[in-house]
């Protein structure tokens, strides 16, 4: 439950054996169909626990629906969602008792990650297709002065922010590890890109789990 007393819908996918690391997923914008079942995150939950021992935590931000249900509240354009991110991080540490937590944001979720996942217990951030529509410069300055790893994967053909534009947008955050992905688009459609992104997540969280199998 959030501090403004909203109940959020979520799911936790946990390995049968040892947990190598935990991953909290912040989904794309629900106004464009984003939710906790957005395909990269759904496939991460289905695969990474067994393949790499990574625990995957997904949830719907306020007012967002998926097959599992609808989170209470209403979409708040990335403002009230700060409470959702805080509640999810607290849940990970206080209820799940995670030891190492990374936060991954995709599209709208990257703005949520940068702006609201500053909790010192978070080990690092992964940004997928960052549009940089809601993150002010002072937030980038915060992360520039922070020692935790932040990695951004920017599709070559992203219609919101391509690699060349990303270099300019992130110029006040030179510490960022910005990785352009040739041939990719904003939504990472296609199994080759899914496997690539899941492999990159594993590389950051649990490199001993590489290479990921093509099938399980």
List the predicted regions and their residue ranges:
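Gly/Ala-rich beta-loop-alpha elbow adjacent to hydrolase catalytic centers
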Residues: 104-113
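Short alpha-helix in the alpha/beta-hydrolase fold that links the catalytic acid
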Residues: 138-140, 148, 161-171, 193
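Catalytic histidine-centered segment of alpha/beta-hydrolase-like enzymes
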Residues: 160, 184-196
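Short beta-strand/loop motif that positions the catalytic acidic residue
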Residues: 146-147, 151-154, 158
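Serine-hydrolase catalytic machinery in alpha/beta-hydrolase-like enzymes
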Residues: 1, 6-98
